[in-house]
């Protein structure tokens, strides 16, 4: 079975009824999640390892749907999520330094906070310098 691209799937969902729309969005999200999980960055893998050593259970590449009137309008896939405590950790690479990406990150963070999540951001460089241990300690103690 040939895999469809995310763009192909997005084109298919236009004009669908809510149930069909949500099913199509779910399909897109799962594919995107899978790709992100398979291609985690070295900094993300290091952060995950440190959290595991500290006994902190985090879901990797976790999807959060943004709904309006029960219809999925968009979704975010966050790097790490403590689903019990509603805590999100984002490991930011260099592309997060661009003004355009910073604006996207700002609105994404606001959406997630509106849903009750606490969002913590840490750069790749900070992970490599060992600051993820300090961040996890600060959040969980």
Residue ranges and their predicted role:
Residues 1-141:
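Nucleic-acid endo/exonuclease domains
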